[in-house]
Amino acid sequence: MDSYKTISREKVGEGYYTEKRSKFLAFSHHVDTVDDVKELVAQYRKKYFDARHVCWAYMLGHERTDFRANDDGEPSSTAGKPILGQINSRELTNVLVVVIRYFGGVKLGTSGLIVAYKEAAALALDDAVEEECLIEEQITYTFTYVMMNDVMRLSLIHI
């Protein structure tokens, strides 16, 4: 049977990383829809209203085709992309990682930002509980009674 990896709904993974007085708070969540993502990001923006940046990335679907990364004002590809990279490196899906940055007064540069967001995301994912889920599909067949033996034989072969 096919399966996919995700993180548990029961526990929010948390991580804390500092670099040159900047503080990075990271959180990983299980999500099922883009609406879940929007709601959680809005909650973090409200809770950490005084933070300089609230950057995030998500991956959705067992085929891992629905994803997005957001830098929230950081230089292009220095925040969201490294966060998404951590999700990808673990082959996870149905996951949102949010990283909140409090600026410490010292600029980190492009490579410093990439490392900081990557490390913070990794810490949050390390703290989460990974799960493997089976892909389930319900299939309904309609057939005549005469075909019963053939259908049963086929269904046993493909289960």
Regions found by a protein language model. Name each.
Residues 1-78:
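C-terminal regulatory domains involved in ligand/effector binding and gene-expression control
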Residues 37-40, 117, 151-154:
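Hydrophobic side chains in well-ordered alpha-helices
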Residues 75-92:
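Positively charged, aromatic-enriched nucleic acid-contacting surfaces
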Residues 93-103:
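Glycine- and acidic-rich phosphate- and metal-coordinating loops
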Residues 116, 120-128:
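Stable alpha-helical structural segments in soluble proteins, enriched in small hydrophobic residues
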Residues 131-145:
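Short glycine-/aliphatic-rich beta-strand segments at the starts of folded cytosolic domains
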Residues 157-159:
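Conserved small/polar residues in nucleotide/adenosyl-binding loops
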